[in-house]
Amino acid sequence: MEPSQRNTKPPSFSDSTIPVDSDGRATVFRPFSLSSPHSRAFHLAWLSLFSCFFSTFSIPPLVPVISSDLNLSASTVSAAGIASFAGSIFSRLAMGPLCDLIGPRTSSAILSFLTAPVILSASLVSSPTSFILVRFFVGFSLANFVANQYWMSSMFSGNVIGLANGVSAGWANVGAGISQLLMPLIYSTIAEFLPRAVAWRVSFVFPAIFQVTTAVLVLLYGQDTPHGNRKNSNQNKLTIPEEEEVLVVEEDERSSFVEILIGGLGNYRAWILALLYGYSYGVELTTDNVIAGYFYERFGVNLEAAGTIAASFGISNIASRPAGGMISDALGKRFGMRGRLWGLWIVQSVAGLLCVLLGRVNSLWGSILVMWVFSVFVQAASGLVFGVVPFVSTRSLGVVAGITGSGGTVGAVVTQFLLFSGDDVRKQRSISLMGLMTFVFALSVTSIYFPQWGGMCCGPSSSSEEEDISRGLLVEDEDEEGKVVSGSLRPVC
């Protein structure tokens, strides 16, 4: 499918030393640079998603204070936690096709602008119903994750996409941990000057302002692809700011929205990855929601200490999830897609076993230590999942990313509903059962098979017809001479 009118000049970036492929995507990952559009997109994407995580998880660390003020029952608090995840299920499913149509930059900014007033409205809640509704709508902001991963896949080539996705999402997820750490401190500071019943309400002004600020930065300094911004949804026009040249693809040459949607929904690999993400990232979300209360109730630590312990779980994302992406890329380079799948299974299985152990440790410091190690593996597993996602479908990448991302929140909703709902929940038992579910569902990775690359237990298909069909939907990496190399990754059996 060739465009009717194409700019024939090679991509021109302010950082002329950055190596790119034929589509202008960076073949190296430089997280500490701002000179190229790739690096700027990376920093804007993770910072925007960071603010959304901060907003969504700004409520749980203040739940003991809010519950006391509004007389919330344990079942109401649990229902609100489920509601926050349920909201993001629908928004993530919608975000994928939206990114395909209008681009990740605009999609991300629109979502942040729409959800910032919701977190601000948390200061106005006065009943259990309004508390649950606020958490439901605040959860919509987590769909920014889909735009984040879509944006990285548009900017970075296949040989570094696992690392780019892992670092971008990992650094963003730290927002949940920082929120657990800072919100009690913000509340305590404000409570020095205002009544407690007012102080917790004023605290929510800060995440709302932060979210709006990042949305403005995304619009001002970001661009959808290495070549420029998508101008509208009817024509795939990309404007190159430096040269004011336009790349045009006529509408009748583009895949229609329906084709994009069907291509993603009909790809079974997307649904398996959604299940795996539900019991890696979904488990992480559930832990973020319950871990502060777990240490507060079981070990009798104070609110600030519980928040600090919970924060350490989320903050480990700064290294753990990127490590998962690095492992995926390293195994992909050495063993091909099969290496990525084996790595995912091993890391997620270990995470499940550690979660089982976390619920069975009876000492405070022992629980903290196991929680730290568990956080490393469960977050790395999330990075490994999105080390596979970009290879499922090029045409329907947004839909596949949306399905997988929604799987994370569906997993969190199901897990919290089954294991952490009600007024008489034994959280230590529920945590161990959550780990067992993680271990069992990790086995589903064995069903993922790519005709040209194989799966965990068998090599690539010898059917050229099946390979040709699949290759048309997959990301293809190219070497410096433009030769496709991703379809011939080395089998291991």
From Swiss-Prot:
Keywords noted in UniProt: Membrane, Nitrate assimilation, Transmembrane, Transmembrane helix, Vacuole
Primary location group: membrane
Organ and tissue specificity: Expressed in seeds, leaves and shoots. Lower expression in roots.
Listed SUPFAM superfamilies: MFS general substrate transporter
Comp. bias (Polar residues): 1-19
Induction, per UniProt: Not induced by nitrate or by growth on low nitrate concentration. Down-regulated by imbibition.
Record-stated family: Belongs to the major facilitator superfamily. Nitrate/nitrite porter (TC 2.A.1.8) family.
Protein name: High affinity nitrate transporter 2.7
Organism in which the protein naturally occurs: Arabidopsis thaliana
